[in-house]
């Protein structure tokens, strides 16, 4: 118990944030403002954008219509929380933002520099390496292979799916959907604290 508590201590400024998005279907109760169609996932609903630390707990959360691209959703999320990056001193290491291949670092950099010109002195984008077929064969693996560090955010997505109220989007507004997402993680973190 003590070891786990010690390991969980985090520094004030993180050095790694993992990003992912998840398309979720709407129910008939969902409002018009939260309806969009994601052609890639063939989902009519919303998209949850999540930024987590190395323990899988959220740094930032944001919900958009499902037809919003991953890049645009991430830009909106980071813009909403730009004060975190403004307050970060220049003398601490850059934050690595690890994204998958659905994101385009050049597009993200150009958009964020318009909002906060000094941001790229404080963060850097990195796409997680996807193992090639030759690498899989060399390791004797086939099909789905866990990508280093990416499993953390995939686990966070599965934590969300364990909340019954998040299986589908029932909320009338995107703000309510984001709040429901935050409540899910607050509940999870409180349970962890209670067991220490």
Task: Show where each model-derived region lies.
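Helix-centric, low-specificity signal for extended rod-like, repetitive segments
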Residues: 18, 41, 141-143, 148, ...
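Tryptophan-centered motif/residue detector
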Residues: 22, 58-59, 151, 159, ...
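Catalytic-loop motifs flanking and including active-site residues across diverse enzymes
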Residues: 70-73, 152, 179-182
């Amino acid at each position: 118990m003590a070891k786990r508590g010690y390991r969980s201590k985090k520094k004030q400024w993180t050095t790694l944030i993992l990003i992912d998005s998840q398309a979720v279907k709407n129910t008939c109760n969902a409002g018009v403002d939260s309806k969009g169609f994601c052609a890639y996932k063939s989902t009519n609903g919303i998209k949850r954008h999540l930024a987590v630390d190395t323990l899988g707990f959220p740094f930032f959360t944001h919900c958009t219509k499902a037809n919003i691209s991953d890049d645009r959703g991430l830009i909106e999320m980071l813009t909403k929380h730009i004060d975190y990056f403004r307050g970060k001193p220049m003398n601490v290491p850059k934050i690595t933002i690890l994204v998958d291949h659905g994101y385009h670092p050049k597009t993200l950099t150009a958009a964020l520099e318009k909002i906060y010109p000094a941001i790229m002195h404080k963060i850097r984008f990195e796409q997680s390496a996807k193992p090639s077929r030759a690498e899989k064969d060399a390791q004797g693996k086939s099909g789905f292979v866990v990508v280093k560090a990416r499993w953390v955010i995939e686990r966070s997505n599965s934590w969300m799916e364990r909340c019954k109220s998040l299986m589908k989007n029932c909320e009338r507004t995107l703000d309510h959907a984001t709040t429901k997402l935050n409540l899910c993680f607050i509940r999870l973190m409180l349970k962890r604290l209670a067991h220490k």
